[in-house]
Swiss-Prot record:
This is Peripherin-2. Residues 44-61, 124-264 are lumenal. Glycans are attached at N53, N229. The gene is PRPH2. GO terms for molecular function: protein homodimerization activity. Residues 341-346 are annotated as: Interaction with MREG.
């Protein structure tokens, strides 16, 4: 028994074809939107690729770009099919291809849904990518004279200013690395010598942060150095003082930015997916309604359209059976090829 059977007369078939034609061209515009979102995300990721781990993947933006292009192609073709469906002579040339085309549309909808899920699930991989990338970026902050790394200081400073953040997880991350280049250290100074000798790795570590960590909204002049030394500053207690530095770490700030971006893109892609599913269902009804016309010479006659020719369970069983037959035929062909090679070897 057919699933979700609907009766169509000529007027209903024409309205369905016209409605699907309009929806397909709207979906072409939606495909352009998805393509644009993927391109925008790719550009945003590349802009900050210097503070991301090298293993950072562009799978999601690339997938959005591909899905956007495919959406434009498939829906343009579907729009042409719906337009020609109004003319029996023109529809005849599409008739043999419509069923395979619907199967491709189902696969496209599955792929689009998976890409939508990836948009919402990207946060986990992005978090580890940012953690490693920012850590390495801060490590190279001082290498202003090293080719290939001389830009890192500007990159980190601009990042901290733009996103109002400091360090990887917080401002104390700067205490654990030497962010001042040896070029600007006076090695004849006793303080510099003592600091380097007191460190196992021979690094010059200070309880200070770069200028880009300063919050300009603070009424107090920025305290960059000796942040943990209360006596170095008037009326200051680092444990209770609300520091005039950015409180948030850059990993959390970037993660929040990209997560909101990905959630918005995921929501848009989900709406487009629902729209595409609706179009595919409509195409299925149009296909079965036109196939069910008993007398092609009488376009006014009624016909029946359905979503599935059989029930869900019967359709699933038939699908599994077809897979088994396909597997057996491949196995027989492989055995035949092996048998043909054996006499040649003899």
């Amino acid at each position: 028994m057919a699933l979700l059977k609907v009766k169509f007369d000529q007027k209903k078939r024409v309205k369905l074809a016209q409605g699907l034609w309009l929806m397909n061209w709207l979906s072409v515009l939606a495909g352009i939107v998805i393509f644009s979102l993927g391109l925008f995300l790719k550009i945003e990721l590349r802009k900050r690729s210097d503070v991301m781990n090298n293993s950072e993947s562009h799978f999601v933006p690339n997938s959005l770009i591909v899905m956007g292009v495919l959406s434009c192609v498939f829906n343009s073709l579907a729009g042409k099919i719906c337009y020609d469906a109004l003319d029996p002579a023109k529809y005849a040339k599409w008739k043999p291809w419509l069923k395979p085309y619907l199967a491709v549309c189902v696969l496209f909808n599955i792929a689009l849904f998976l890409v939508t899920l990836c948009c919402f699930l990207m946060r986990g991989s992005l978090e580890s990518t940012l953690a490693h990338g920012l850590k390495n970026g801060m490590k190279y902050y001082r290498d202003t004279d090293t080719p290939g790394r001389c830009f890192m200081k500007k990159t980190i400073d601009m990042l901290q200013i733009e996103f109002r953040c400091c360090g990887n997880n917080g401002f104390r991350d700067w205490f654990e690395i030497q962010w001042i280049s040896n070029r600007y250290l006076d090695f004849s100074s006793k303080e510099v010598k003592d600091r380097i000798k007191s460190n196992v790795d021979g690094r010059y570590l200070v309880d200070g942060v770069p200028f880009s960590c300063c919050n300009p909204s603070s009424p107090r002049p920025c305290i960059q150095y000796q942040l943990t030394n209360n006596s170095a500053h008037y009326s200051y207690d680092h444990q209770t003082e609300e520091l005039n530095l950015w409180v948030n770490g850059c990993r959390a700030a970037l993660l929040s930015y990209y997560s909101s971006l990905m959630n918005s893109m995921g929501a848009v892609t989900l709406l487009v997916w629902l729209f595409e599913v609706t179009i595919t269902i409509g195409l299925r009804y149009l296909h079965t309604a036109l196939e069910g016309v008993s007398n092609p010479e009488d376009p006014e006659c009624e016909s029946e359209g359905w979503l599935l020719e059989k029930s869900v369970s019967e359709t699933w069983k038939a699908f599994l059976e077809s897979l088994k037959k396909l597997g057996k035929s491949n196995q027989v062909e492989a055995e035949g090829a092996d048998a043909g090679q054996a006499p040649e070897a003899g």
